[in-house]
Amino acid sequence: MSSKPQSIGVIGAPFSKGQPRGGVEEGPTVLRKAGLLEKLKELECDVKDYGDLSFADNLDDSPFQIVKNPRCVGKASEKLADVVAEVKKTGRISLVLGGDHSLAIGSISGHARVHPDLCVIWVDAHTDINTPLTTKTGNLHGQPVSFLLKELKEKMPEVPGFYWVAPCISAKDIVYIGLRDVDPGEHYILKTLGIKYFSMTEVDKLGIGKVMEETFSYLLGRKKRPIHLSFDVDGLDPSFTPATGTPVQGGLTYREGLYITEEIYKTGLLSGLDIMEVNPSLGKTPEEVTRTVNTTVAITMACFGVAREGNHKPIDYLSPPK
């Protein structure tokens, strides 16, 4: 496959306060060190690097009920939303390098300011749809979708730090792929709101080809619209991405991860991308960190056109040498 070069705006979001484990704030650094931006440029993408955001460490951040670090997390997403919106106004695809998945509140909010008709494909072992009232852990990286859904607006308490958030997607605008660790309250929300999901059971039953076909038919069947892919590396099996905060056995294979992203690229509709929850501190060995980072880079590259069948430039490779 070859097509016109894509323009990308890369935003590093070194933030960890949506969950308890240190190290996830190093995600952008290790992905940059692995040469991600250079590889995108080799693909002839037009890459603009917006650098890494800096996040204030709000010392006076007492919990809201059991919700931890609400002001820090809310402020970080607010800052990210502004930068993503800025990137989208230039017509670039926003590429957010996390950081923990609470940042999706900001990434999707900012994207929706410019493209309110967007749809979301959420690849993850978890639904991240607990509300501040259903959460058992209080970690905000397990709650971003609840802040984004219009249908949950009335069920959400006023959490300090989140006054700026306006729900921007409906239940019918999101599809989950890779689920295998869903809390009872989350399962209730999925079922009550009729949210479309493909847990690992459906992936096993249907195969990833059918899963993507059904995903596109569901989200794009009536009208082509911008896609926001929010990719938590724990959606993949921990044999491929061990260095992450909440790994769950029995996940998507390397091949399934590539298939998902290759197919999204082929639609030509990818408009925003989050690459979340790479935590180099949680690799048991340096090799586990390298494996996680290399897998994550490969998944990201597939979003921008690297295909397993190969790629070529639009020239005649068989023309006789001059």
UniProtKB/Swiss-Prot annotation:
Q: In which pathway does it act?
A: Nitrogen metabolism; urea cycle; L-ornithine and urea from L-arginine: step 1/1
Cofactor(s) annotated in UniProt: Mn(2+)
Positions carrying N6-succinyllysine: K17, K75
One GO biological process term: urea cycle
Record InterPro entries? Arginase (IPR014033), Ureohydrolase (IPR006035), Ureohydrolase_dom_sf (IPR023696), Ureohydrolase_Mn_BS (IPR020855)
Which residues get modified to Phosphoserine? S7, S62, S217
* Disordered: annotated span: 1-27
> Cofactor note, please?
Binds 2 manganese ions per subunit.
Q: Please list the residues that bind Mn(2+) 2.
A: D124, H126, D232, D234
Which positions does UniProt annotate for Mn(2+) 1 binding? H101, D124, D128, D232
Record field: catalytic activity: L-arginine + H2O = urea + L-ornithine
- Outline the subunit composition: Homotrimer. Interacts with CMTM6.
Protein name from the UniProt record: Arginase-1
Q: Which gene encodes it?
A: ARG1
